[in-house]
Design a protein with these regions (language model features):
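Amphipathic alpha-helical scaffolding segments comprising HEAT/armadillo-like alpha-solenoid repeats
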Residues: 2-14, 33-45, 64-76, 96-115, ...
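Alpha-solenoid HEAT/ARM repeat scaffold
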Residues: 10, 22-23, 38, 53, ...
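HEAT-repeat alpha-solenoid elements in large eukaryotic scaffold proteins
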Residues: 14-18, 45, 84-88
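Alpha-helix N-cap/helix-start positions at coil->helix boundaries
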Residues: 18-22, 34, 49-50, 65, ...
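Acidic (E/D-rich), amphipathic helical modules within compact regulatory domains
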Residues: 48-61, 73, 79-82
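Eukaryotic acidic, Ser/Thr-rich intrinsically disordered low-complexity regions
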Residues: 150-186
Length: 186
């Protein structure tokens, strides 16, 4: 199956670190759904950052209440690609619905920290999306977005922060909808 010697979920998780096999392994793990979650969670501790990144991407679709804490912890990973995937998974409601949408008590502090201080502009841009989920209900989130919009060294982060900050188009849409709306611009 899939040209792999072993096809158990643990072996497929390790294949996420192999550029030749990552796509097929990802698709197969995703198709296994809940049956793969345990192996995916274990993969968050793999030495290979590509495996950790792939596991965060999978948890974007497969996260459950038991794995949410581990996904939040991945926002502090030393590899920027892993942090980006973790922030996307935490911010994106489109892929998982509202069943596991994390509340501000679990995710806002790490998102605020990375928005203000992460050295990678792509990580800060993804942190904008997570902070933006709470800009209508938390003054700290709104203030952090305004600060980022005005002062972030990256023009792309400043622009994105403006979309999510009070007065921005995504913020305006969120004011008209529940706080757990999808983060993707329409």
């Amino acid at each position: 199956m899939l040209g792999f010697v072993r096809t158990d979920s643990e072996a497929l998780v390790s294949c996420l670190g192999d550029p030749q096999r990552t796509t097929a392994a990802y698709r197969e793990l995703l198709s296994r759904g809940d049956r793969a979650v345990s192996a995916v969670r274990a993969g968050l501790r793999d030495a290979n950052p590509a495996v950790r990144e792939g596991c965060c991407r999978l948890l974007d679709h497969l996260v459950d209440t038991d794995s949410m804490g581990e996904l939040v912890a991945m926002a502090g990973d030393p590899d920027a690609r892993v942090r980006i995937a973790a922030f996307h998974a935490l911010a994106c409601d489109r892929c998982k619905g509202d069943t596991c949408a994390p509340g501000p008590d679990r995710v806002l502090e790490p998102a605020l920290h990375h928005l203000a201080a992460d050295p990678d502009p792509h990580v800060r841009a993804m942190a904008v999306e997570l902070v933006g989920k709470f800009a209508c209900s938390d003054a700290r989130a709104a203030a952090a977005l305004r600060e980022s919009q005005a002062n972030d060294p990256s023009p792309a982060v400043r622009k994105k922060a403006g979309w999510y900050a009070p007065g921005g188009p995504i913020h305006a849409r969120r004011q008209r909808r529940p706080a757990t709306s999808a983060h993707h611009p329409e």
